[in-house]
A protein has these predicted regions:
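C-terminal amphipathic helix plus adjacent low-complexity
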Residues: 300-348
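Active-site proximal beta-strand in glycosyltransferases
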Residues: 109-125
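Donor-nucleotide binding loops and adjacent catalytic segments primarily
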Residues: 22, 169-242, 292, 296
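Catalytic binding pocket for nucleotide-activated donors in carbohydrate/polymer assembly enzymes
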Residues: 252, 256-307
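A donor-sugar binding/catalytic signature common to diverse glycosyltransferases
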Residues: 95-101, 106, 116, 236-275
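A nucleotide-sugar donor-handling region in carbohydrate enzymes
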Residues: 125-191, 210-212
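Conserved nucleotide-sugar donor-binding subdomain of glycosyltransferases
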Residues: 65-94, 99-102
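Conserved nucleotide-sugar phosphate-binding/catalytic loop shared by glycosyltransferases and other
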Residues: 8-12, 27, 31-78
Length: 348
């Protein structure tokens, strides 16, 4: 069996999940990988990448919201269309897609079945958290960003038959968990000044902030500015007292797996993060609208009363891969059976 796996590279979560899935898939089939999106990700990825397209990328304001004007102006939609037409999808038996538009749209236009495998796909289920009606347009955009005929989603709860629990990296599963008293902060859509403005008002707290703005670590009063590094981040996460993070699925999943208290600040206008944050709140977690002095008291209350969300993330990663492949084989067998049945009916 030959499989094409399209992976979105915005953030590190899609790559981290694909890394685990592909390590299992390659033991069962031949796998080609296509990336699209930014190239400056910090997750090590050993499997060969057949092609890395520019794709589509979201841009953000300095205060943690999607910058829609910049997103529209800085993406090259003509190049995107050419890449979609040129992408080879006919050479594969199975096409998997983690929110990656090139392989998804190429499959759609060339009448090839594409199976979604992403956190975003779970938002399309009617059985998950209900969002405000004002997000109806955002859901439509989400559906057509990387269209798929069917798929599997990931979330903190199995609220539908095709929803899995999060994929947890092997490196995270092996970590020794303790509490060294510091707090980890990961808010990639905020710039350093906005983060510093709030964190320095807690002088007794040791903050480790991971930011793409730094090429080398730097100490500034009680703030340790860290570069984005997979190993450093994982070790800091395992030994922290709590985590302040955006509502990105992977960081939240890993923090919950390690039983760390989380304070969640979703990116403004980002439907997936708003959805994730809503579920975190429903599970008893703390969510604030933005990082600002206005919300200082809520941050202080969270520090004084840390709460671990009770959740079991004990799913085996190979169970996900096996379910996908078994479903695919069953659907192919059923399709052949129906074809034979139709042929025999017409013949007789």
């Amino acid at each position: 069996m030959k499989i094409l796996f399209g992976v979105q590279t915005t953030g590190n979560g899609h790559i981290a999940r694909a890394k685990e899935i592909i390590s299992i898939l390659t033991k069962r089939a031949e796998v080609d990988v296509i990336f699209s999106g930014p190239k400056a990700n910090k997750i090590s990825f050993k499997h060969p990448i057949k092609k890395h397209y520019r794709g589509l990328t979201f841009f953000y304001t300095k205060k943690g919201k999607i910058h829609w004007v910049k997103t529209l102006l800085k993406n090259n939609f003509l190049k995107l269309f050419i890449d979609i037409l040129e992408c080879d999808v006919h050479s594969y038996d199975l096409i998997l897609n983690d929110f990656e538009p090139i392989t998804a749209w190429s499959s759609y236009l060339k009448n090839k079945k594409c199976i979604a495998l992403s956190n975003q796909f779970s938002l399309l289920s009617d059985k998950g958290p209900k969002l405000n009606k004002r997000f109806k347009t955002s859901l439509r955009i989400l559906r057509y960003f990387a269209p798929a005929q069917s798929g599997y989603g990931f979330h903190f709860k199995k609220f539908d038959t095709n929803i899995f629990l999060p994929i947890i990296r092997k490196e995270i599963r092996k970590l020794k968990v303790n509490d060294l008293g510091h707090y980890l902060v990961y808010l990639p859509s905020y710039n350093r000044d906005e983060i510093k403005k709030v964190l320095i008002t807690f002088p007794s707290i040791k903050w480790f902030v991971f930011s793409q703005e730094f090429e080398t670590p730097k100490l500034e009063k009680n703030i340790y500015w860290e570069t984005i590094n997979e190993n450093t981040f994982s070790k800091c996460l395992a030994s922290c007292k709590g985590v302040i993070t955006a509502a990105g699925f992977s960081t939240l999943s890993e923090a919950l797996y390690l039983k760390k208290p989380v304070l969640t600040i979703p990116i403004g206008s980002h439907i997936e993060q708003i959805y994730n944050a809503k579920m975190i709140r429903e599970m008893g977690g703390i969510v604030i609208k933005r990082l600002s002095i206005k919300h200082r008291k809520q941050i202080q209350n969270w520090i004084k009363n840390p709460k671990v969300i009770p959740i079991k993330l004990n799913q085996k990663n190979y169970e996900v891969v096996d379910r996908i492949l078994i479903d695919y084989i069953k659907s192919k067998a059923e399709s052949k059976y129906n074809s034979y049945k139709t042929f025999l009916t017409k013949t007789i």
